[in-house]
Regions:
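Conserved "HGTGT" condensation-loop signature of ketosynthase/thiolase-family condensing enzymes
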Residues: 1-156, 177-180, 196, 201-225, ...
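Short loop-beta-helix segment that forms the pyridoxal 5′-phosphate
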Residues: 155-162, 556-560
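A short, small-residue-rich loop immediately preceding and capping a beta-strand
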Residues: 157-163, 185-191, 585-591, 727-732
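Internal active-site segments that recognize and position negatively charged phosphoryl groups
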Residues: 174, 573
Length: 750
């Protein structure tokens, strides 16, 4: 394993928001005391007057200024603006198409990871209005990201994760983890959220939107304003950057991720999850007793968030908080959702480069409520900043923080990455065992709940969860929680062990019923309409949020979405998280609910089959071998390895090649793939023929005669584990990617 604890660096930082499309441009505007929260014509919907002749509210938000695309001329702004930021970052890091191809031929392993709150939701709105299949097909995040990466020379895809508004910082942590695991050499961490009616209406119906200027940490703060943002970073080892002549903008010193396990839309008042994330991120400063020279707070200007965040900062720094300058950038650019942490980190890097820290707008901290807060206001503050932190908090209690050091500093300090002690105590990659499994799928031959759809009987879920807590939840959320409960029961975990678990949830479609209900209502009745519960249950990280809330998870939790292989991707990210020592155990869930519109779209796209669609969920408890041994647990199986492969080009041939590589990454005695009757099954068959003989063993498809999205691969993994044999589960995605899991049952000798 190549060492990375001695240094990970950022060699590019591109950002785009309402104040500009370069970090130095954004900073310059902030230093001139500019804000850019005004009319937002890019929001698709309109307000409807409550009565004839009644005034209609103005749509005010912070969108990226309209301009002609330089690259990536595609159907919608997400792909267009994301492509521009990606190309900007690659140019800054001296990574043109030819250079990337040369480095790949020399063995450099590139990966891209994406973070977002709402992904391709704008395409869903367009499709609901125009009925065009092209619009609806672009809804999945894998399609958005593939388009944005076109022409770069990089593989056309990457896992899309969501920790709601903590996605930007979480994406950087995932990128760094891939390098710590020595499974990649250069990561592009991308975070984005286009301005959208779905987000605007959602925050409006939750009554979180301010009518006036944003006033963070003040006594009269009244709410947030929606923004739009894109942030792209290049992450690599310090030694690799030096060898290729790249200039480090900053060094990553640490990061932290946690969960409140408190409430879906309100932070824990004591800020406990955020405090844990901040403490973990800033551990590198502890030996020298230094403090960050600047903190970019999450600071949404909502009463509950600002109070909870102050509690977290106070818990993390104590009385020394008064010596830490804090800024609140959303007061100038709105809340850019999944891109917030990334855009704000890019601005912080510009501030470090220019030795000028931007102040919050419209704000002087309420001294009575926030007595130790040094909030920058009424002008920028000059001075060298060598260490800075960014804090991000999201729906469902997702908390994340990151600490960076200036690229040029006279007195660098050693980084302290999560799991550093565990990595230092072992020279070998630790075995990851499966200690628990929960499966919820309909029985074969069950009566359909709708034409072509199979569902679980309600009694399959009865008694597993708090009936009152789940009564109004989306079916998807109930499935995630129930499967997770079954898995931890099977693993024999106590409450304390469960709280310490990380959580990773994979899904292709999430909660389509509530999502479609909310969207159709706002299209019909205007931006002021919408059920707040339906909005909250529609965000892409709802699975991991409900897993945390339902089971009480307090470590990192996030969702992976938009692909058939999302369950495999969740297992893959969890394995890396465990093998780098960041946590002792993790709960991984794949879940899907059914909906007739989803079935119709898949059929019209040629991705469906005559097999019925089924709802369901599968959950695993993954543990480091040392953790399982220390608590006296019993292994049910082993996650030997995992792989996620993205194609170099589009088309069926590229999909087949991705799957061939995924199979080769985990070659074993048997390979299991999708049902033969499906498009994915046919791609699997082509890949198996292309792969050639595997030697001893068999190859075949999942025997259950139904389709269930991201649940299928994990259901196959559960079958292999329970058989006591060893095998590879290999699955293609319609966007061209492929994933594999190598599973070994406890009775297997191979």
């Amino acid at each position: 394993v190549r060492a990375a604890d001695d240094g990970l660096v950022l060699t590019a930082a591109a950002a785009s928001c309402s104040l500009g499309e370069h970090r130095s441009e954004i900073l310059a505007a902030m230093l001139e005391d500019q804000t850019a929260i005004d009319e937002a014509p890019a929001i698709e919907g309109v307000f409807v007057a409550e009565s004839p002749g009644a005034p209609v509210p103005m749509i005010r938000a912070a969108q990226v200024p309209e301009s002609e695309p330089k690259v990536g001329a595609v159907a919608d702004r997400a792909e267009k603006l994301l492509s521009r930021s990606i190309h900007q970052a690659l140019a800054e890091a001296s990574l043109d198409h030819q250079t990337i191809e040369r480095m790949q031929s020399e063995g450099t392993r590139f990966e891209t990871v994406f973070g977002t709150t709402l992904g391709g939701m704008r395409h869903l709105g367009a499709g609901l209005r125009n009925g065009r299949l092209e619009s609806l097909s672009r809804t999945t995040t894998a399609t958005v990201t593939r388009t944005a990466l076109a022409g770069t020379g990089l593989p056309l895809g990457g896992s899309t994760v969501s920790a709601a508004c903590a996605s930007g910082v979480s994406t950087l942590a995932i990128a760094a983890t891939a390098i710590l695991a020595d499974e990649a050499d250069l990561l592009m961490a991308v975070s984005y959220d286009p301005i959208s009616e779905f987000a605007f209406a959602g925050f409006t119906c939750l009554r979180l939107v301010s009518e006036g200027p944003l006033r963070p940490f003040t006594a009269d703060r009244a709410g947030m304003r929606l923004g739009e943002g894109y942030g792209v970073f290049i992450v690599e080892r310090a030694g690799d950057a030096q060898a290729r002549g790249a200039r480090p903008l900053a060094r990553i010193l640490g990061w932290g991720g946690a969960s409140d396990a408190h409430h879906l839309t309100q932070p824990a008042p004591d800020g406990r999850g955020a405090a844990r994330a901040i403490r973990e991120a800033t551990r590198a400063l502890e030996p020298s007793q230094r403090l960050p020279g600047l903190i970019a707070a999450h600071a949404t200007s909502t009463p509950a968030n600002d109070a909870a965040e102050y509690s977290a900062l106070s818990a993390a720094f104590g009385g020394r908080l008064r010596d830490v300058p804090v800024t609140a950038l959303k007061s100038r650019i709105g809340h850019t959702l999944g891109a917030a942490g990334a855009v704000e980190l890019a601005v912080v890097l510009a501030a470090m480069e220019q030795s000028k820290s931007p102040a919050a707008a419209n704000a002087e901290a309420d001294g009575e409520s926030f007595p130790d807060l040094d909030l920058l206001h009424e002008g920028s503050r000059a001075g060298c900043v060598e260490h800075a932190a960014v804090v991000s908090l999201g729906f469902g209690g997702a908390d994340a923080a990151i600490l960076v050091e200036a690229g040029e500093t006279s007195d660098p300090i050693p980084p302290h990455f999560p799991g550093q002690a565990a990595r230092a105590s072992s020279t070998q990659r630790e075995t990851i065992l499966i200690s628990g499994c929960g499966v919820l799928v309909p029985e074969v031959g069950k009566t359909p709940v709708r034409v072509g759809e199979l569902g679980l009987d309600d009694d399959a879920l009865d008694g597993l969860d708090d009936a009152r807590a789940v009564r109004r939840l989306a079916r998807f959320s109930r499935l995630v929680r129930a499967a997770g409960i079954l898995a931890v029961q099977d693993a024999g975990l106590d409450d304390q062990e469960i709280r310490a678990c990380a959580g990773f949830v994979g899904t292709r479609f999430g909660a389509p019923e509530y999502t479609l209900d909310f969207y159709q209502e706002l299209i019909r009745d205007g931006l002021g309409a919408g059920n707040p519960l339906h909005f909250a249950e529609s965000v892409p990280n709802i699975g991991s949020a409900q897993l945390s809330l339902g089971l009480g998870l307090e470590a990192l939790t996030l969702s992976v979405g938009g692909t058939v292989i999302a369950g495999i991707e969740a297992m893959h990210l969890a394995r890396r998280h465990l093998q780098t020592g960041q946590v002792d155990r993790a709960i991984v869930v794949a879940a899907e609910e059914t909906h007739p519109m989803v079935r119709k779209i898949l059929h019209d796209l040629g991705h469906g089959s005559e097999l019925p669609n089924t709802e369901g969920a599968v959950a695993f408890v993954l543990e480091r071998e040392s953790s399982l041994r220390d608590r006296g647990g019993v292994a049910k199986g082993e996650l030997v390895d995992s792989a996620v492969i993205w194609p170099a080009s589009g088309g069926t041939h590229a999909s087949v090649e991705s799957l061939v590589r995924a199979i080769s990454e985990g070659a074993a005695q048997s390979v299991v793939g999708p049902p033969a009757e499906t498009l994915a099954g046919r791609v699997f068959g082509l890949a198996m023929r292309r792969r050639g003989p595997l030697g001893v063993g068999t190859r075949g498809s999942l025997s259950r005669p139904f389709e269930n999205g991201s649940v299928g691969p994990l259901l196959a993994a559960a079958d292999v584990m329970r058989s006591g044999q060893a095998g590879v589960i290999a699955w293609p995605d319609s966007a061209g990617g492929a994933g594999s899991l190598k599973i070994r049952g406890v009775s297997s000798e191979s």
